[in-house]
Amino acid sequence: CHLEDITRSDIYGFVIPFCVELMKLMDEYKIPIKIRACDTMGYGVNFPGAVIPRSVPGIIYGLTTHAGVPSELIEWHGHNDFYKAVNNSTTAWLYGASGVNCSLFGIGERTGNTPLEAMVFEYAQLKGTLDGMDTTVITELAEYFEKELGYVQPSRTPFVGSNFNVTRAGIHADGLLKNEEIYNIFDTGKFLNRPPLVSVSNTSGLAGIAHWINSYYHLPKEKWVDKNSDLVKKIKVWVDAQYEDGRVTVLTDSELVEEIGKCCKELNITI
């Protein structure tokens, strides 16, 4: 049963009495009746002290305690109109809903629904395990959507955007070189097949250039270059010259590869 627009409804005047009657029918006919609490316009909040009908904890509490709906038969259906789809879905879990409705990458009406990939990592953080889920599939799905459906993720989208683990600050890149955990949310290479990257610009510094070379060429750790490398220093001079001439955009991979090739020949080295 879809309880549409529940965050603007009369919870104790209609919703709870209605669900009580549904539970009676379930007991009489021995057929499970699933209750889907739909935050149709995204008005739900998880703030302590918030009152119904907007309180997500209050709604779930009312369904379980006063309507007698078993936890395993409660689902939360969220919308992202106020950027609360993920928070409210997680809150519904914590207060007794066993299911959360999701869509891949949050694609849905208006501002979208709860992203499936977000709830995968919410689950992992709550439970301390992925329970066998292969999260690298998230990256494969994003690539499929882009190549086959023409759907390009906004670059800053967590887990799937092109820039979600890319740093442009030289000091951050220096930290990545020394210890990836400092400036990467988790082992994105392991869990998403997306190692952290840096964009090379006038703010990247020597460390940023070194990290780009190590990442782009997939160099084994024993062959990593660092900010003391002659190659890195030579590339840095070239990068600085680009911006002194008025450039305002980050350097592309192809530009860097071409210049690195030239510098390697001049230095008589190979990567």
What do these predicted ranges mean?
Residues 84-90:
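Short, acidic/polar
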Residues 128-271:
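A mid-to-C-terminal "edge-of-domain" accessory segment
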Residues 1-3, 33-37, 72-78, 100-102, ...:
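Hydrophobic faces of well-ordered beta-strands that scaffold small-molecule active sites
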